């Protein structure tokens, strides 16, 4: 039997995802449990975190387990990921040893590793996460790399709670690009597109120009999900028509992939579209729609104060749900091992 990881939701069946969401809702009602009693998880952070680190540490504790946080290059040795490399530079040990040793100590490994923002053809291979999964003898959880599957489930649970049903089919869902002074990772956008189409919603990807359309892998996943789950998928560059009648508006900033690693000429293009900010006028076009964002969010850059403080904003609910869905993920995966 092969080891089951949580690297992206597309690897899990709809029934398995529904089971995770059901368990997360149960954990939300009953905080403490014993599913991880005597178990441990190594949380490996190559990039900063607030919600992810806090929710995973507390989640393990609340289920009777223990979390160990490691930051390679800071409080742990820098890691090499390429085979055949003559390691006479800054890296001190190879992932082949790191993952296998950690797997002898702990029962789960979580990994957060953002793209390097230099070469998308390399970053899209998700080398760090896949290397941990390759060598680890215990399940690996994606804590955000080029996708953010934990955020996907937290978002889905928040929507199910708001609409009072696990069935989100037929809801009009807008994934809108928003301005940010820096080019950001596409991970959350990739994940939002994936889970929204998986849930059978009518999804519109709203972005300024074709350059901001997401990587073809995730567009293909979305099309596959539409075929299997119903719903629809379209790309729009027209703000008002995209917002019109929307039940859900989900905002995220990301850099244009054609400029990946060459961001200087992309910045003046991005700067032209600061009006993509989510504001009261746009939300008034919706069907009393809810707004959410993965956080952190720069107020009055990505969304206005009024939108963030509106009763229709469910971003805090979504953030809370990170705790509950991650407990469900850990509980579902723990106990597996391979020689």
From Swiss-Prot:
Site annotation Key residue in conferring substrate specificity for N-acetyl-L-ornithine versus N-succinyl-L-ornithine: residues: 92
Broad class of enzyme this protein falls into: transferase
Any one of the GO CC terms: cytoplasm
Entries under Gene3D superfamilies matching the protein: Aspartate/ornithine carbamoyltransferase
Compartments (UniProt record): Cytoplasm
Biological process terms in GO annotation: arginine biosynthetic process via ornithine; citrulline biosynthetic process; L-arginine biosynthetic process
Subunit structure: Homotrimer.
Protein name: N-acetylornithine carbamoyltransferase
Organism: Xanthomonas campestris pv. campestris (strain ATCC 33913 / DSM 3586 / NCPPB 528 / LMG 568 / P 25)
Gene name of this polypeptide: argF'
